[in-house]
């Protein structure tokens, strides 16, 4: 059973609240879950302490069992100092080739 720690949406229309849950990855986003680990309210100010509440002992226990956090939960855990988030691989894109650079320089000179 591949377990993932992710956000499950709750709340009403236009006023989302998310539960941080440990769930089987095959279950729907808002469907059945194994255990609730905390909650997240994105509408609160970022400096408010109640914006994100996590039971860190439960989260650490699930990580020890092999649960994988989702991207957003991985950001939360990195900010809390629980698990270091791996940096994204952002390859260098759209670097002009040498010939194009030479053509651009020649065009700029003339």
UniProtKB/Swiss-Prot annotation:
Region of interest: Disordered: 82-110
GO molecular function: structural constituent of ribosome
UniProt entry keywords in alphabetical sequence: Ribonucleoprotein, Ribosomal protein
Pfam families, A to Z: Ribosomal_S16
InterPro entries assigned to the protein according to its UniProt record, in alphabetical order: Ribosomal_bS16, Ribosomal_bS16_dom_sf
Swiss-Prot/TrEMBL GO biological process terms: translation
UniProt key word rRNA-binding: no
One cellular component (GO) term of this entry: small ribosomal subunit
Keyword Ribonucleoprotein recorded: yes
Annotated PANTHER family: 30S RIBOSOMAL PROTEIN S16, SMALL RIBOSOMAL SUBUNIT PROTEIN BS16M
Record-linked HAMAP family: Ribosomal_bS16
Family listed: Belongs to the bacterial ribosomal protein bS16 family.
Protein name stated in the entry: Small ribosomal subunit protein bS16
Species this chain originates from: Nitrobacter winogradskyi (strain ATCC 25391 / DSM 10237 / CIP 104748 / NCIMB 11846 / Nb-255)
Taxon lineage: Bacteria, Pseudomonadati, Pseudomonadota, Alphaproteobacteria, Hyphomicrobiales
Gene that this polypeptide is encoded by: rpsP
């Amino acid at each position: 059973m591949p377990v993932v720690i992710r956000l499950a949406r709750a709340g009403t229309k236009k006023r989302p609240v998310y539960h941080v849950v440990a769930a089987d990855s095959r279950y729907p986003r808002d469907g059945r879950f194994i255990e609730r680990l905390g909650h997240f309210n994105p509408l609160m100010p970022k400096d408010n302490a109640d914006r994100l509440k996590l039971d860190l002992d439960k989260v650490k226990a699930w990580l020890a069992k092999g649960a994988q956090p989702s991207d957003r939960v991985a950001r939360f855990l990195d900010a809390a100092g629980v698990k270091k988030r791996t940096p994204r691989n952002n390859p260098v894109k759209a670097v002009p080739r040498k010939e194009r650079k030479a053509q651009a320089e020649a065009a700029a000179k003339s």
